């Protein structure tokens, strides 16, 4: 079971990387800012990234289900010779109690007949101080990186501290 779980985690992380590469070639590469667990794991050099979803904030795009669907459709339509296809399964609003709106995109990715579910949580209006950075996201299985926008380390840490303080409960983040 452990090896099966590890294989599922590896495949999910690989598919999230594939999504990021599609993003890096899309018209939205300068609007989509990576944050959250996947970024933290990449920054500190964890090989076994076990985050359940991809977290991002969007700049200059309304965060409505319709606008996010157009954005994700454009990203997954980017043609890359990687053998991976994506399909949106559902899009719903999240963070109703938060100051800023958010959207959760549930997708499936397919690679060589293996179907892997993915979730992307998207927000807007987040303060990134002083600003987002160009980040060279190192791929797990290839000796190269993807150029994407990401939170700077200070904002990642500040957001994690805010989560701990405002929720006043222990969570997995």
Say what each PLM segment does.
Residues 1-173:
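Compositionally biased terminal segments of proteins
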